[in-house]
Amino acid sequence: MKKLGIIICGLVLVMGCQRNVYRFSEGSVYGTVYHVSYQSEMDYAVEIRQEMERVNQSLSMFNKESVIARWTRGESERVDSLFVTMYEKAREVNEVTGGAFDVTVAPLVNAWGFGFKNEKLPSDEKIDSLLQYVGMDKVQLEGERLVKLVEGVQMDASSIAKGLGVDLVAEFFDRKGVQNYMIEIGGEIRVKGERNKK
């Protein structure tokens, strides 16, 4: 009987220690690196990566099958819930900044060569000609459809994608009851609870 008590105490102690384990996950995503530290008895490395991949499937211009890439090519006006979240946050920040933040700048970004390589800088005339395609007033969300009010409008969500990736991982942790975590993707950070003291 005494041995059984010792075994049970030992198991409780081991399980208690496992709950205090801080886990670390890191790698490359969205053209940058990520670092995630969280306290959990479960290893969520695969799930963390899956949450980040949701952003690539929806908002990456480098994934030709992403929602935003198909929308830009005019193949579909239908968008997914993550795209809608991005659009609504982008519109909100656009209004707060008086238009300084604008995800419809993709034609200008591409002309300057940041997205798709371009050897020479665009002329003032080229820039002026592209401005007709820039502005949140050029698109309208209608349920699960994002309608182009001006043909030629494109979006570049790279300025908001890393933050959305961080939010998705944090929401996953919250659903799983993880109380202590730090998520960083390319400088975008979200923390909750206590830090790892080691």
Q: Residue spans of the language-model regions?
A:
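Short beta-strand segments
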Residues: 184
